[in-house]
Amino acid sequence: MELKRVVVTGLGAVTPLGNNPEETWKAMLEGKSGAAPITYFDTTNFKTKFACEVKGLNINDYIDRKEARKLDRYTQLALISAIQGVEDCGIDLDKVNKNRIGVVYGVGIGGIKTFEEEISYYALHKEAGPKFNPFFIPKMIADIASGHISIRFGFH
């Protein structure tokens, strides 16, 4: 197999240290930690009280509210970092062959927040029978982030 060149021309980052590459890099150079008390959910019944959460990010600065509701949080963050990367590289999407642009996005588990919400809803309403949100599977699958990035920019 012949190795091909890959060129990284733009950066995007949504991290516990910052909501863009500049903020993240600055915090890293200053030796800051992204770990802080958990605010995303009630930790009363958990031993762990600290995590590295993304803070202060307004999703709707990047993604339309209606579209954001259809996406799990991990997909929202992936899409935002991709939007930043495309903006950073300054590419003119009307002048490139989108068939030559690929999207690779790695994640260990897909939409875990969606999974937790659906299972919790089912546990509370199981007497009504199984009834899941029609976006349950599309929001959960691990490759959906790269799919939404490709859709957003028309990459093939």
Q: Where are the regions a protein language model picked out?
A:
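Conserved "HGTGT" condensation-loop signature of ketosynthase/thiolase-family condensing enzymes
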Residues: 1-155
